[in-house]
């Protein structure tokens, strides 16, 4: 990797897995399968080798955050205010962010049984399709200008200050925000924020989403591998959409396989690859930790900020 990573320490998988004492995976194979995204691939060994050491590392950051908050309260002669520990997770479409986010949520819940661990995706902060159509932005969906960043930053500010906050809910089945549906958050102990844009800054040059994060992860992989995963996932979505005529993807479900692959490859190249190269990948050095995946979805290298 380039000088972009000069501030990171590279750790091999073999070295990383020694940073946690051998233990059970804290979840069953069935539970792991239930939280794994379409066409993603993760094993119990991955949980033990990669994610249990990661949980240990998050605990290190959490203790440091609590100690700093305590020291600040003493300095300012104020009562200590307990704040949620916020984890940001970013990476390309189809790289496996959702699997990682759900797995971390489950593992944190198991290792902190008395804590409330919540998960929110930034998809809910996309503008509704009708607004995007009116603004001529529907073909830019997923790009920075398609997100209501003011609403997202207000949400994070409320969370960080221990206030009850509400997030819109996005449905991939209808490819749109669900009208009048909100997800509520009441001062969780941990909040995982997952999305392609969590390290980006749009319009407001003085404030980044990452300013609210106590820990952050970027899921990385070669773009040619992500393209393959994206196409495989698209084909799996079409199979499911055949059973539901109301699904947004039902309109593509009857395409011959070759045409469906060609369509997905075109969307990847004209939308997702451009978004990755221009707006997502350039932000990865803002993460505290980079998890790099090989062609088989397995994490082979870890980069930890020095």
Curated annotation (Swiss-Prot):
EC number: 2.7.1.33
Keywords: ATP-binding, Coenzyme A biosynthesis, Cytoplasm, Kinase, Nucleotide-binding, Transferase
Coiled coil (UniProt feature): none
GO cellular component: cytoplasm
One GO term of the biological process aspect: coenzyme A biosynthetic process
Domain of life: Bacteria
Pathway where it operates: Cofactor biosynthesis; coenzyme A biosynthesis; CoA from (R)-pantothenate: step 1/5
GO molecular function: ATP binding; pantothenate kinase activity
EC class: transferase
Localization in the cell: Cytoplasm
Catalytic activity: (R)-pantothenate + ATP = (R)-4'-phosphopantothenate + ADP + H(+)
UniProt-listed Gene3D superfamilies: P-loop containing nucleotide triphosphate hydrolases
A Pfam family matched in the record: PRK
Binding site for ATP: 91-98
Family annotation (NCBIfam families): panK_bact
Record family assignment: Belongs to the prokaryotic pantothenate kinase family.
Name of this chain's protein: Pantothenate kinase
Source organism of the structure: Streptococcus pyogenes serotype M49 (strain NZ131)
């Amino acid at each position: 990797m380039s000088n972009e990573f000069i501030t990171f320490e590279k750790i091999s998988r073999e070295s990383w897995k020694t940073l946690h004492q051998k233990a059970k995976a804290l979840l069953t194979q069935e539970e792991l399968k239930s939280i794994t995204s379409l066409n993603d691939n993760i094993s119990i060994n991955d949980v033990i080798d990669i994610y249990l050491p990661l949980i240990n590392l998050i605990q290190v950051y959490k203790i440091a955050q609590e100690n700093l908050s305590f020291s600040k309260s003493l300095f300012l002669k104020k009562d200590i205010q307990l704040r949620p520990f916020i984890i940001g997770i970013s990476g390309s479409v189809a790289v496996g962010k959702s699997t990682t986010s759900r797995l971390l949520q489950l593992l944190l819940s198991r290792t902190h049984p008395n804590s409330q661990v919540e998960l929110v995706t930034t998809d809910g902060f996309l503008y509704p399709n009708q607004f995007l159509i009116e603004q001529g932005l529907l073909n830019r969906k997923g790009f920075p200008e398609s997100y209501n960043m003011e609403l997202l930053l207000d949400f994070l500010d409320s969370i960080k200050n221990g206030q009850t906050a509400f997030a819109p809910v996005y449905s991939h089945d209808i490819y749109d925000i669900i009208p009048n549906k909100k997800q509520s958050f009441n001062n969780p102990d941990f909040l995982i924020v997952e999305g392609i844009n969590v390290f980006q800054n749009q319009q407001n040059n003085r404030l980044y989403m990452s300013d609210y994060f106590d820990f952050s992860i970027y899921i990385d992989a070669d773009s040619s591998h992500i393209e393959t995963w994206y196409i495989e996932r698209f084909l799996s979505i079409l199979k499911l959409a055949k059973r539901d005529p109301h699904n947004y993807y039902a309109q593509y479900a009857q395409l011959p396989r070759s045409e469906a692959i060609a369509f997905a490859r075109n969307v990847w190249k004209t939308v997702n690859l451009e978004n990755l190269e221009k707006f997502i990948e350039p932000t990865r050095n803002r993460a505290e930790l980079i998890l790099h995946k090989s062609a088989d979805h397995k994490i082979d290298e870890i980069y930890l900020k020095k």
